[in-house]
């Protein structure tokens, strides 16, 4: 059955190579990958890092987004790990000091909205050098994170607003929807890879086209520390 196939695939990839999901359900494969006895855990939080080519300007740029694949509704500690994983990938892609936007519906902290509170905490942690290797700001609405026009119109002062390299979503639903919107509406080149595992793991959608799977493979190779 699929559960046994997933276990065998996990055991096999420990010998070398990359684990690429085929027609098996994502939940089934992730359960094997995350198994505490024989899975691919390293002790780090595992997260999915999505990379796309932003083509809105004359010169396209790579932008990362996380986590739309593993962590359902991360708390502050998990969000910090997700950020560190994404920053690690950004460094591998040549982005020396990535600008990280913590996304929410608004750019102000609302005591009734958990994601804005978490964003405020994490932004302060970055200012106090508790999170390094990047510049973090949030909460930021999506337009404020990626559009300098929106930033100017709203009068926002931020080292990240309008030029984010990494977008951190508050939960898996937001990330999954955002990723699929880029793929199906914008038709942007995309790819993604799991970070925090003993071996590279690619959780591609069963509906992904061959070019997306190729991008995922290239990304996993680039992010490999072998």
Predicted features, each with a name:
Residues 1-160, 164-226:
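Anion-binding alpha/beta catalytic cores of soluble intermediary-metabolism enzymes, centered on
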């Amino acid at each position: 059955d699929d559960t046994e196939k997933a276990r065998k695939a996990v055991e096999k990839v420990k010998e070398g190579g990359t684990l690429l999901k085929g027609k098996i359900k994502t939940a089934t494969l992730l359960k094997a990958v995350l198994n505490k006895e024989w899975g691919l855990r390293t002790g780090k939080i595992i997260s999915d890092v999505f990379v796309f080519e932003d083509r809105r300007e004359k010169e396209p740029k790579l932008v990362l987004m996380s986590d739309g694949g593993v962590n359902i509704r991360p708390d502050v500690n998990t969000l910090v790990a997700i950020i560190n994983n994404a920053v690690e990938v950004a460094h591998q892609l040549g982005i020396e000091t990535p600008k990280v936007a913590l996304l929410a519906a608004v750019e102000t902290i609302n005591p009734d909205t958990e994601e804005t509170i978490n964003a405020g905490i994490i932004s302060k942690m970055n200012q106090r050098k508790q999170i390094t290797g990047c510049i973090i700001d949030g909460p930021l609405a999506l337009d404020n994170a990626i559009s300098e026009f929106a930033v100017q119109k709203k009068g926002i002062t931020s080292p990240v607003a309008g030029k984010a390299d990494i977008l951190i979503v508050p939960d898996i639903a937001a990330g999954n929807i955002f990723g699929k919107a880029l793929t199906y509406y914008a038709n942007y080149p995309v790819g993604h890879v799991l970070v925090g595992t003993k071996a590279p793991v690619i959780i591609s959608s069963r509906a992904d086209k061959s070019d997306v799977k190729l991008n995922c493979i290239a990304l996993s190779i680039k992010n490999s520390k072998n």
